[in-house]
């Protein structure tokens, strides 16, 4: 459990708002906070709650059959700052007309869209076809990156990682061009080099490749693909290694080092398109092989100026109070 809807729910709980709150889970075995109703995704109760709820809070699209009724308020938090182009901004042929029109239909039902930055406030409404109210509040899911300190030790202990070890989180995104014969997304893993003594590796497969991540898992890595809250992993890690994933924007709230393993950079950019010059603005070094990256892990270079510029551009509101601002704006202070 996690992400912005969860943090918004927790803020409402703190305020004893009196709202009857339900939280959607994928499995009946998942736990929800006291006083919150558990609703299993795909169940009859879930369909009923979609129809009856006054407020809907989601970080992704609702099912195609859903039609917002009069009086419902739909708060869309979205699920990350984009490097790669989205929706109608994709000009490379990677997006079908069906996808673009379906996205626009979905966005037409949103009343509010949460944004972490002026960059997203400009890009997301245009790309997704949204014309409602943008709440440039910061991402509620990132509040804990600012406010929590005890989580780091707890998570590392649960993973069997000592305080003295350097914990590297490898979190690659999925590829439009990589699918199996069945149509599922293929796993992605370019981290094929061993870490030196004193370093440990966590592997976090993308949600789209969960069914394939086992075969992609780097040897000796700690598999955290199904760990429930990636924010815990950001707090536990000392270094992030990613490629084009939006985790780069969230992790940068911590101020900890990042490196980018991008052997297919030219191909990926040509296929999807980027919103900015990634090579010029990246807040850490870019590597074309894992062996090069591992050799440089002890000294990733001075990226302080680029890192600071990155945070100002993409994380200007991340002060630990984003959920407070969203709740104030939607439900009233």
Can you describe what each PLM-predicted range is?
Residues 56-57, 111-117, 202, 240-241:
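A short beta-strand/loop micro-motif in the catalytic core of glycosyltransferases
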Residues 1-49:
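N-terminal pre-catalytic "stem/leader" segment of glycosyltransferase-like enzymes
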Residues 136, 216, 246-314:
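Catalytic binding pocket for nucleotide-activated donors in carbohydrate/polymer assembly enzymes
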Residues 56-78, 82-85, 227-272:
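A donor-sugar binding/catalytic signature common to diverse glycosyltransferases
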Residues 39-54, 207-249:
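Donor nucleotide-activated moiety binding/catalytic core segment of transferases
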Residues 318-333:
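C-terminal alpha-helical cap of glycosyltransferases
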Residues 1-16, 127, 137-216, 287, ...:
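Conserved catalytic-core segment of nucleotide-activated headgroup transferases in glycan assembly
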Residues 81-180, 207, 306-309:
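A nucleotide-sugar donor-handling region in carbohydrate enzymes
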């Amino acid at each position: 459990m996690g992400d912005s809807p969860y943090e918004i729910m927790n803020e409402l709980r703190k305020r004893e708002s009196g709202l009857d709150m339900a939280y959607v889970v994928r499995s009946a075995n998942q736990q929800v906070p006291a006083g919150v109703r558990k609703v299993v995704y795909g169940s009859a109760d879930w369909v009923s709650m979609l129809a009856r709820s006054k407020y809907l809070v989601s970080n992704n699209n609702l099912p195609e059959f859903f039609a917002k009724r009069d009086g419902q308020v739909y708060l869309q938090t979205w699920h990350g700052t984009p490097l790669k182009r989205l929706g109608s901004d994709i000009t490379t042929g990677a997006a079908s007309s069906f996808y673009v029109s379906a996205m626009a239909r979905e966005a037409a039902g949103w009343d509010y869209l949460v944004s972490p930055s002026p960059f997203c406030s400009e890009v997301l409404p245009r790309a997704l076809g949204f014309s409602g109210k943008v709440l440039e509040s910061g991402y509620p899911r990132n509040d804990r990156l600012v406010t929590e300190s005890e989580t780091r030790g707890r998570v590392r202990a649960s993973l069997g990682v000592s305080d003295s070890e350097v914990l590297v989180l490898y979190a690659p995104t999925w590829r439009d061009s990589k699918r199996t014969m069945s149509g599922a997304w293929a796993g992605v893993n370019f981290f094929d080099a061993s870490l030196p003594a004193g370093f440990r590796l966590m592997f976090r497969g993308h949600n789209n490749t969960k069914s394939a991540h086992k075969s992609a898992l780097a040897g000796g890595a700690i598999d955290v693909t199904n760990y429930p809250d990636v924010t815990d992993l950001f707090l536990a890690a000392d270094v992030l290694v990613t490629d084009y994933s939006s985790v780069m924007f969230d992790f940068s709230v911590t101020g900890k080092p990042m490196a980018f393993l991008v052997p297919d950079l030219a191909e990926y950019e040509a296929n999807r398109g980027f919103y900015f010059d990634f090579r010029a603005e990246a807040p850490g070094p870019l590597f074309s092989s894992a062996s090069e990256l591992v050799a440089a892990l002890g000294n990733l270079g001075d990226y302080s100026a680029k890192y600071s510029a990155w945070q100002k551009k993409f994380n200007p509101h991340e002060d630990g109070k984003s959920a407070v601002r969203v709740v104030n704006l939607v439900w009233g202070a």
